[in-house]
Swiss-Prot record:
Official protein name in the record: Phospholipase A2 inhibitor CNF
Subunit relationships: Occurs as a mixture of oligomers. Tetrameric arrangement appears to be the predominant quaternary structure. Interacts with phospholipase A2 crotoxin basic subunit CBd; the interaction leads to dissociation of the CA-CB heterodimer and to inhibition of PLA2 activity of the CB subunit.
Function noted in UniProt: Inhibits the PLA2 activity of crotoxin (CTX) by replacing the acid subunit (CA) in the CTX complex. Displays a pro-inflammatory action through activation of important main signaling pathways for human leukocytes, in vitro. Abolishes both the muscle-paralyzing and muscle-damaging activities of CTX in mice phrenic nerve-diaphragm muscle preparations.
Cystines in this chain: C22-C46, C25-C32, C39-C67, C73-C94, C95-C100, C118-C143, C136-C165, C169-C191
Entry's localization field: Secreted
Similarity remark: Belongs to the CNF-like-inhibitor family.
Presence of the UniProt keyword RNA-binding in the record: no
GO MF term (any one): phospholipase A2 inhibitor activity
Post-translational modification comment from the UniProt entry: The carbohydrate moiety increases the inhibition capacity of CNF, but is not essential for activity and for oligomerization.
Glycosylated position list: N176
Tissue: Expressed by the liver.
SMART domains: LU
This protein's UniProt keywords: Disulfide bond, Glycoprotein, Phospholipase A2 inhibitor, Secreted, Signal
Amino acid sequence: MKYLHTICLLFIFVARGNSRSCDFCHNIGKDCDGYEEECSSPEDVCGKVLLEISSASLSVRTVHKNCFSSSICKLGQFDVNIGHHSYIRGRINCCEKELCEDQPFPGLPLSKPNGYYCPGAIGLFTKDSTEYEAICKGTETKCINIVGHRYEQFPGDISYNLKGCVSSCPLLSLSNATFEQNRNYLEKVECKDAIRLASL
């Protein structure tokens, strides 16, 4: 059930764009075939996003091709340690043409805990999921907190939130978020220093 919720959450994070023509599709896996669609301002580039949820030896990947705003392209890539040995990772590839090159996913680093932690949470249909302690590893010294919602005709208003450890703060902010014609809203993008674990 956790994987089902996560897959749904990954699809929500990638907003549909609506004056360039780009390929449009979503799928579970590494690639998808779709149809060409006109983009509208501020979505001015074509993009391909690969998303992955990894937990221990298991992983699920999804692919999304769409129109994007240049601000989304600045993210490039992200790796969020959501705790419980689980990661959500993304690779964003933007280009002038419909075909975009992939950025491969490297293997997860075998990093050790670094003495810091962040609130960890992953929620769908809620902005206030129960938090747990996500133990940061390696170079992860920042805490990320993203909250938003997306309106669909069915099932309606879908809320989501994501919290965990990251190595650096993303360039994404509320000021450059894509609102997708009042369908997709980022309500909070917060990044701050991780919390040091208490000494035993």
